[in-house]
Curated annotation (Swiss-Prot):
Domain of life from the UniProt record: Eukaryota
HAMAP family assigned to the protein according to its UniProt record, in alphabetical order: Anamorsin
Post-translational modification Phosphoserine, affected residues: S177, S182, S183, S213, S270, S303, S305
Protein family: Belongs to the anamorsin family.
Subunit structure of this chain's protein: Monomer. Interacts with NDOR1. Interacts with CHCHD4.
UniProt motif Cx2C motif 1: location: 272-275
Ligand binding ([4Fe-4S] cluster): C272, C275, C283, C286
Motif residue range(s): Cx2C motif 2: 283-286
Protein name, per record: Anamorsin
Span list, region Linker: 173-222
Role summary: Component of the cytosolic iron-sulfur (Fe-S) protein assembly (CIA) machinery required for the maturation of extramitochondrial Fe-S proteins. Part of an electron transfer chain functioning in an early step of cytosolic Fe-S biogenesis, facilitating the de novo assembly of a [4Fe-4S] cluster on the scaffold complex NUBP1-NUBP2. Electrons are transferred to CIAPIN1 from NADPH via the FAD- and FMN-containing protein NDOR1.
SUPFAM superfamilies: S-adenosyl-L-methionine-dependent methyltransferases
Length: 310
């Protein structure tokens, strides 16, 4: 039996299931207790009761599962996550499980790659295979009896994984440098600076051809655009012209000017133009005599008597 790197004073958990032979389990526990000594501890736990046992987090240095000779244990994702939880940071998990070498759809037995992925997803690192070997006749019989699985392409895979040296949610102080950084400017290459420098003398030098920006424009570019051409295609369509909200094409101003012209043209006009000022400015024959002054354009109704008198 491999010692799995167990030393004195360590806490070890041994996981077994109904396929584990009792005598083989007892022999394994005795050997582990001899390795851990009086300061260490070996705990034996049934895999079906592991989740209900409520072991404290980070309780064990080593977890062994399915290692008992003759055992054919299958490990679910929940079981693997619980094993990772009870491991101390830096602790190791060793497990053995029958794996399928053929491609079988919806198989309860994992392939080797899927088993490695399951350990990684449970939170373990440095996952690697340790040993592959054929199943013994007793193990093949155990798979059929306890797992109800029949296949001629099974192997026994021993695999290990390590818990990271930190707990989930733990914090660590960052070592930040508080030394004042030099604010010196980078050195400038004189040759490069001279290359990109254009002096006033160069500007007046006739040998230097400078492009006149106005020459880049043709007569068409200098024409003032027609406001109608700037209007949106759908602006003002329909029987009633109406400017859009936040109009920017000029239709709103155009409609406002048309409205002002209509108001001016609709205002009543008099011959002298002074009727609205009051009687002091009205003609002798003005029909508005005797009426108070009014604003220009204000609608004033005249009675029939006033019209006949006028």
């Amino acid at each position: 039996m491999a010692d799995f790197g167990i030393s004195a004073g360590q806490f070890v958990a041994v996981i077994w299931d109904k396929s584990s032979p009792v005598e083989a389990l007892k022999d394994l526990v005795d050997k582990l207790q001899a390795l851990t000594g009086d300061e260490g501890r070996v705990s034996v736990e049934n895999i079906n009761q592991l989740l209900q046992s409520a072991h404290k987090e980070s309780s064990f240095d080593i977890v062994l599962s399915g290692i008992i000779p003759g055992s054919t244990t299958l490990h679910s994702a929940d079981i693997l996550a619980e094993m990772a939880r009870i491991l101390r940071p830096g602790g190791c998990l060793f497990l053995k499980e029958p794996v399928e070498t053929a491609v079988v759809n919806n198989s309860k037995v994992k392939t080797a790659s899927k088993l490695c992925s399951a350990l990684t997803l449970s939170g373990l690192v440095e996952v690697k295979e340790l040993q592959r070997e054929s199943l013994s006749p007793e193990e093949i019989q155990s798979v059929r009896e306890h797992l109800g699985y029949h296949s001629d392409s099974l192997l026994s895979l021993q695999i290990t994984g390590k818990k990271p040296n930190f707990e989930v949610g733990s914090s660590s102080q960052l070592k930040l440098s508080i030394a004042k950084k030099s604010s010196g400017k980078p050195a400038v290459d004189p040759a490069a600076a001279k290359l990109w420098t254009l002096s006033a003398n160069d500007m007046e030098d006739e040998s230097v051809d400078l492009i006149d920006s106005d020459e880049l424009l043709d007569a068409e570019d200098l024409k003032k655009p027609d406001p109608a051409s700037l209007r949106a295609p759908s602006c003002g369509e329909g029987k009633k012209r109406k400017a859009c909200k936040n109009c920017t094409c000029g239709l709103a101003e155009e409609l406002e000017k048309e409205k002002s012209r209509d108001q001016i043209s609709s205002q009543p006009k008099s011959a002298c133009g002074n009727c609205y000022l009051g009687d002091a400015f009205r003609c002798a024959s003005c029909p508005y005599l005797g009426m108070p002054a009014f604003k220009p354009g204000e609608k004033v109704l005249l009675s029939d008597s006033n019209l006949h008198d006028a």
